[in-house]
Amino acid sequence: MKEIFFNEPLKIKSSINNVKKFLISNKPLHGPGENILKIKQLLLKNFGFRNVFLTNSCTSALEICSLAINLKPSDEIIVPSFSFITSASSFARTGCKIKFCDIEKKTLMPSLKNISSCITKKTRAIVIVHYQGYSVDYIEKLKKICNSKKIFLIEDAAQAFGSY
């Protein structure tokens, strides 16, 4: 039986050369360097975003989201039952209740039906994780539900950037 590797690292020579060039340049590893500014411009141009705020990780981005929406201990947030730990822990630190939503066996993501069944009057946010390069196929419907119920929709696309 042939072995199938999960998350086998991909080494692209140009990426290795760019990292090497950057490290040799002795430029700071933080702040708005020229590469960060290039990435921001690329995102603004190619995706039509109004604003771009880059972070060092999806964990940081989710923690910023949890603070930005001002969660209280009486609030609930819905997250997929199968995801990286920070999908929940970034919000748990606010004291809110985390509701884990069942996923579908085929997609490893929650269905719209499963998410809808988790929503209560206390739901303040829903975290959707676009997993392994795949986006959920019901995002527009979910946006409408969230808008009608005044629920924040947070999309974690760390594993599926640019997919649709």
What name fits each language-model region?
Residues 57, 82, 131:
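Flexible loop residues that form catalytic
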Residues 106-164:
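Active-site phosphate-binding strand-loop segment of PLP-dependent enzymes
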Residues 53, 78, 99, 152-154:
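Structural detector of well-ordered beta-strand residues that form the stable sheet scaffold
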Residues 63, 88-89, 136, 140:
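Alpha-helical elements of the RecA-like P-loop NTPase motor core of helicases
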Residues 65-119, 127:
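Conserved PLP-anchoring active-site segment centered on the Schiff-base-forming lysine
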Residues 1-68, 72, 128, 142, ...:
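Conserved PLP-binding active-site segment in aminotransferase class I/II-type PLP enzymes
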Residues 12, 62, 84, 108, ...:
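Alpha-helix N-cap/loop-to-helix initiation residues
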